[in-house]
Amino acid sequence: MIWNSKTLSAVLGITISNSISCNEVQFNSKDVKKGNLFIALQGNRDGHDYVLDAIDKGAAAVIISKRVEINDKDKIILVDDCFEALQKMALYKRENSKAKFIAITGSVGKTSTKEALKVLLQHDFLVFASRGNFNNKLGMLINLASMADDTEYAIFELGMNHKGEIRELVQILKPNIAMITNISEAHLEFFNSLEEIAEAKCEIFANFSKNDIAVINADTNCYNKILSILKNLSITDIHSFGRSAKTSAELILYENLGEQVYLKYKINKKVLDVTIPFIPRHFTENYTGVLLIIDILGKDIEIAANHLANISPTKGRGEIINIQNCRVICDYYNASPQSMKAALEYLKQVPAENKTAIIGDMLELGENSKRLHEKLVQYILDAACSKVYLVGVNTKYINDLLPAKIAKKYFKNVDELITHITDLFEGNELILIKGSRGVKLDKIVDYYK
């Protein structure tokens, strides 16, 4: 139980006479499960139009700001402004929580890093991790409002595509530990340089107090820029991770054993050896930072490292599934130049006689789009793909540069691909599907499954 009548009355400044007991807060009726608290927010659609649907799905209570005709009046919580009510609930949770708050940002790797840290901590502690990649202001408020009072560690990912967004988030979240996974060209459409992206990401440290801790990827672009910003903020408790022996945490060795990988880490002078099911190198590099945080928290990193084997990619983020006779790497949730390079290197690492790449546009790159798409050609060639399907306006630049020896086809959109390629999964192939979410490459998997 996360909310009851007494607490809601106090937080919202209203009187709730009926008995209410509910758990997670939802604003999308599609996500409502039995016992949830539904809040009718006004966005592109009016949440009040979905109150009945939420109740049908088992909502224990609904927060509304205008009258809705429903039979079960005891479930109604009437407020003046639903979004203001949500903010009050989120602030109450943060201000009254005894949890250690950990915030993660970066151009890529936020969600996978957050989920990895959750897996390593949840075996011994009560852990709350923000749901999915819901990392904007609304997402943070909904997640905070859904946090149990006895949470010991709260892990949030924070996203942005404009300056000032993360600063606003941390004023509410007040993280005790903040991590930057990397700085790359994602969202470059909205910035003039990588340095500007770094500055925006460093807003995660804007609300730091004396004892708060910064964790930084030393291999990232703009590392020195980040250190300079931290210095100007008078932040001194800084820990780095990466491939260098000079860092606090180092990935010493990544060895591909076929079905498995052997990893050797050094975390604050402690060496760890672990063999886990095969995952691409870029995931294990992020694990370096995760293990570093575990060590900073004073936990047993040897026990934590043994749980690395329990981490599996989430849907659309490198998950491998079988469709007909093919193994399919589903990495279509999002794409930036760095994550696209990592995905193609992953394809290169996995042994297979026949490899196909389905590449969708990388969005939000602005005037750099043509150049950054063209840079992918060499990575596609290195992956030894026998077939390449290109989807979207910007992948036309790739199509123009790929040699004739590769069987290639270009499509303006994903529906065109689905219509024209009817035998996509009939061969015995390894297929990578990678592109920005806006290209909707997930429709390929949904169509064939």
Swiss-Prot record:
Keyword Amino-acid biosynthesis: no
Amino-acid positions noted as binding ATP in the UniProt annotation, renumbered to this chain: 106-112
Family: Belongs to the MurCDEF family. MurF subfamily.
The entry's keywords: ATP-binding, Cell cycle, Cell division, Cell shape, Cell wall biogenesis/degradation, Cytoplasm, Ligase, Nucleotide-binding, Peptidoglycan synthesis
One Pfam assignment: Mur_ligase_M
The protein's name: UDP-N-acetylmuramoyl-tripeptide--D-alanyl-D-alanine ligase
Top-level taxon in the UniProt lineage: Bacteria
One of the protein's GO biological processes: cell wall organization
Known EC number: 6.3.2.10
Main EC class the enzyme belongs to: ligase
Entry's localization field: Cytoplasm
PANTHER family: UDP-N-ACETYLMURAMOYL-TRIPEPTIDE--D-ALANYL-D-ALANINE LIGASE
InterPro entries listed in its UniProt record: Mur-like_cat_sf, Mur_ligase_C, Mur_ligase_C_dom_sf, Mur_ligase_cen, Mur_ligase_N, MurCDEF_CellWall_CoF430Synth, MurE/MurF_N, UDP-N-AcMur_synth
Listed NCBIfam families: murF
Reactions the enzyme catalyzes: D-alanyl-D-alanine + UDP-N-acetyl-alpha-D-muramoyl-L-alanyl-gamma-D-glutamyl-meso-2,6-diaminopimelate + ATP = UDP-N-acetyl-alpha-D-muramoyl-L-alanyl-gamma-D-glutamyl-meso-2,6-diaminopimeloyl-D-alanyl-D-alanine + ADP + phosphate + H(+)
Signal peptide residues on this chain, from the entry's feature table: none
Purpose of the protein: Involved in cell wall formation. Catalyzes the final step in the synthesis of UDP-N-acetylmuramoyl-pentapeptide, the precursor of murein.
The protein's annotated pathway: Cell wall biogenesis; peptidoglycan biosynthesis
Taxonomic classification: Bacteria, Pseudomonadati, Pseudomonadota, Alphaproteobacteria, Rickettsiales
MF-aspect GO terms: ATP binding; UDP-N-acetylmuramoyl-tripeptide-D-alanyl-D-alanine ligase activity; UDP-N-acetylmuramoylalanyl-D-glutamyl-2,6-diaminopimelate-D-alanyl-D-alanine ligase activity
